[in-house]
Amino acid sequence: MQTNLSQLIKVARGETEADLVLLNARVINVFNAEIEQANVAVFDGKIAGVGDYRHGKEVIDLKGAYLLPGLINGHTHVESSMLDIAQYARAVVSHGTLALITDLHEISNVCGKEGIDYVLDASADLPLSIFLQVPSCVPATHLETAGAEINSQDVADLLRLPNVTGLGEMMNFPGVLFGVPSVLDKIIAAAGKVLDGHAPGLSGKDLNAYISAGIHSDHECIHLAEAKEKLARGMYIMIREGSSEKNLAELLPLVTDQTYKRCLFVVDDRSCADLKSDGDIDAVVRKAIRLGLDPVRAIQLASINTAEYFHLQGHGAIAPGYLANMIVCQNLEQLDIDMVFHKGKLVAEKGQALFKPQSRIPKSLLNSIHIRPFDTKDLILKTIQPQIPVIEVIPGQIVTRRLDLKIPAENGVIKANTELDLLKIVVMERHHQSGNMGHGLIRGFGLKKGAIASSVAHDSHNVVAVGTNDADLYTAIKELERINGGIALAVDGQVTASVSLPVAGLLSTKPLEEVVTELEEINNQVAKLGCKLSAPFATLSFMALPVIPELRLTDLGLVDVKTFKLIPQET
């Protein structure tokens, strides 16, 4: 160790040759927001110096290309890609993401700590630094049934692991506000660490109370005024642009010379199709630049700001002593990535990963769909109420609206009405064979025929299905049982397409390209049935999440998120 440090110092002083020298670079300096003409010397995976360096075991002339720090995704759920961690790395490293922060609450809601162990173990040899925010909400709330639990003692144990930065998004904001002991115990266990928030729409004294508990950030802002209030009260604002959650255009005016250090870019949830076609955090940077943000400022929000918020020493900049995680591109505004270096090693070029990761998936994670036997009669929606609460989807957002509509019933039975775009939605418990099943109506999917189903249903990941009739709902759900989890489409009693996600019912075992092709096929079929949503299965996956306003459906029933209570259903 001392020998390497001594050699690093000698390389920095120009007394001995570097492992790698990058000549004639236009270096993006994230500390002073300037672009510097310089050479960069690398030794033992670190940057030795920026300046006049010419002697190295390997020398690459960049001929005036831009050299950027590796990008950092400050908040993402890798499971939303539907890829196992090895294939996920292939997808994002080629787009310049060399570090990320995730809380893995998707897979841990199904498999507990075993799911976390799988991701951390499988990522150990990848050219991608994964930092963990310990899941704070497994289960997310008492209003649904999860497959596992991570309690305050588990949180304390996980916080001692390497590469753990703090406590993941505290979604149970009512639990914070009402002082629920089990919630507060987790916050206390993470004292001194970074505590991420999740507080959609919270303001005034409730916001003060939430922040006073020690929570530092929020990524759920959808309106500029909301983001301004939270920033003014001391929060870091994670500006999100994912596959279903698109908040960048609305929130970008928040970034000024006075506020930019309190802002960072995140994707939260991004599909493998979007990762392949558009990219990861680089896509957010490109869009921010198109919307008028200065390119260097945009890079700061995807590198040094994130590193400093999470206290990631050695990440986020091209400077002496920092990790040699670097990106080469010709056009800063287009961010067309030519080369990606991880610790000084070329790991991707022209959009192609140069490494071949090996998947290491425990067999115990491959059997997670446990549904009590059911038939179409169990899917019937009955009511004697004059008005029915209906979930309304908002395109491009994961928040929903509550509609209370008069729906005609036949002998107390409510059926879907495709002319009014009123479809049936069902959530079925799939971890313990309890038989729990929630029923409701939803508007916004636009299906004219058939049904879609998914075992990806944030955050407890029970089975969620939307359809025009009970027979197709039944067929789609039974297909999920057959393939050990995934997504499915059924029309006229037949399965017309499905994508198997056997790892915890969330992730595929197939290569990136195959998964993307399968997803494109099923999405195209859904579109032909009348659905106008750009990402129907991504949207479907959030309909059972009872911590995002206004109305949700879990296996226990309809949830009014404003009151954080189940809505009684009189039948």
Curated annotation (Swiss-Prot):
Q: What is this enzyme's catalytic activity, as reactions?
A: adenine + H2O + H(+) = hypoxanthine + NH4(+)
Which SUPFAM superfamilies does the record associate with it? Answer: Composite domain of metallo-dependent hydrolases, Metallo-dependent hydrolases
- Where are the coiled-coil regions? none
Q: Annotated Gene Ontology MF terms?
A: adenine deaminase activity
List the keywords (alphabetical). Hydrolase, Manganese
Reported cofactor(s): Mn(2+)
A Pfam family of this chain:
Amidohydro_1
Q: What is its EC number?
A: 3.5.4.2
Query: Entry's CDD domains?
Result: AdeC
Question: Is Hydrolase given among the entry's keywords?
Answer: yes
Q: Give a GO biological-process term.
A: adenine catabolic process
* Similarity annotation: Belongs to the metallo-dependent hydrolases superfamily. Adenine deaminase family.
Protein name, UniProt field? Adenine deaminase
Please name the source species: Dehalococcoides mccartyi (strain CBDB1)
Q: What is the lineage of its organism?
A: Bacteria, Bacillati, Chloroflexota, Dehalococcoidia, Dehalococcoidales
